From Swiss-Prot:
Keyword NADP set for record: yes
Single GO cellular component term: cytosol
Enzyme class: oxidoreductase
Keyword Amino-acid biosynthesis set for record: yes
Active site: K70
InterPro entries in UniProt: Aminoacid_DH-like_N_sf (IPR046346), NAD(P)-bd_dom_sf (IPR036291), SDH_C (IPR041121), Shikimate_DH (IPR011342), Shikimate_DH-bd_N (IPR013708), Shikimate_DH_fam (IPR022893), Shikm_DH/Glu-tRNA_Rdtase (IPR006151)
The protein's name in its UniProt record: Shikimate dehydrogenase (NADP(+))
Gene Ontology molecular function: any one: shikimate 3-dehydrogenase (NADP+) activity
Annotated Pfam families: SDH_C, Shikimate_DH, Shikimate_dh_N
Protein keywords: Amino-acid biosynthesis, Aromatic amino acid biosynthesis, NADP, Oxidoreductase
Catalysed reaction, written as an equation: shikimate + NADP(+) = 3-dehydroshikimate + NADPH + H(+)
Enzyme nomenclature, EC number: 1.1.1.25
Pathway: Metabolic intermediate biosynthesis; chorismate biosynthesis; chorismate from D-erythrose 4-phosphate and phosphoenolpyruvate: step 4/7
Length: 277
């Protein structure tokens, strides 16, 4: 008598205790009555390759990857999606039957799905997007926005050199502005995105001037702790449509869950409540 294997998946990072992914995937497993497990794993940098070679032999079908391993796993992958290659990092791994590693990055997908569900009147072709920050999250957002058809991205970061590097990587659809001058271009923006940690619990507040922000601009913040950052509060006061950052986390988990467990999950109010709870 053959026994059906129960699929195993998880999330790997260091530290890992803060991750919301276990609550998210366990909620979906329970909601859809799927036999499967999703486990958090704290893994040191020196052990990443060994873990990735071992997990498929233990019955794991895939893995989410969080900081600081998102770039390292890309170098160990056998197959890499175009978007993961452009971003230079992977957050979703799927293991083949012989242990081969397929690497993807669903951060940009999650960002766009969250934006589209929270700001239904926003369309990419409306006009420029102003992006605050130039780290890994900014790369994912830029790749997604350019691919969606945003005509221009105005990029600013407290360290100018990092913005210049992204402009060099992505070309003339990205324009770099000094952090201190951003208020002067906000009136152009159809979309404003904060990809920095400013405004997060335990981090400094957003100090960039928002004087030029107009009511026609959609504003979204990747920070989700707190759900309503100072940036979103100011934007609401100015009449802007705002979108918090929690939905990006939820939506980026959809493709991996579908690949590992065979069911495409929905992101609902119950999903948000399960992760926040």
């Amino acid at each position: 008598m053959s026994m059906t294997k129960i699929p195993l998946a998880g999330v790997m990072g260091a530290p890992i205790a803060h991750s919301k992914s276990p609550q998210l995937h366990r909620h979906w497993l329970e909601t859809y009555g799927i036999s499967g497990f999703y486990v958090p794993m704290e893994v040191k940098a020196a052990d990443v390759e060994h873990v990735l070679r071992t997990l498929p032999k233990m019955g794991f079908v895939g893995l989410n990857v969080t900081l600081p391993h998102k770039e390292a796993v890309l170098k160990l992958a056998d197959q890499i999606t175009d978007r993961a290659r452009l971003i230079g990092a992977a957050n979703t791994l799927t293991f083949g039957k012989d242990g081969e590693i397929h690497a993807d990055n669903t951060d940009g997908y999650g960002f766009l799905e969250n934006l589209r569900s929270g700001a239904t009147d926003w369309t990419p072709s409306q006009g420029p997007a102003v992006v605050l920050g130039a780290g890994g999250a900014a790369r994912a957002v830029i790749v997604a926005l350019l691919d969606a058809g945003v005509p221009e991205i105005i990029l600013t970061n407290r360290t100018r050199a990092r913005s210049d590097q992204l402009q060099s990587d992505f070309g003339n659809r990205v324009r770099v502005m000094d952090w201190t001058q951003i208020s002067g271009v906000l009136h152009e923006a159809q979309l404003l995105v904060n990809t920095t940690s400013l405004g997060m619990v335990g981090k400094p507040e957003m100090e960039a001037s928002l004087d030029g922000l107009q009511a026609h601009t959609t504003v979204t913040d990747l920070v989700y702790n707190p759900l309503k950052t100072r940036l979103l509060e100011v934007a609401e006061e100015k009449g802007c449509v705002t979108v918090d950052g929690l939905g990006m986390l939820l939506h980026q988990g959809v493709p991996g869950f579908e690949r590992w467990f065979g069911r495409r999950p929905d992101v609902t109010d119950a999903t948000r409540a399960a992760v926040l709870g």
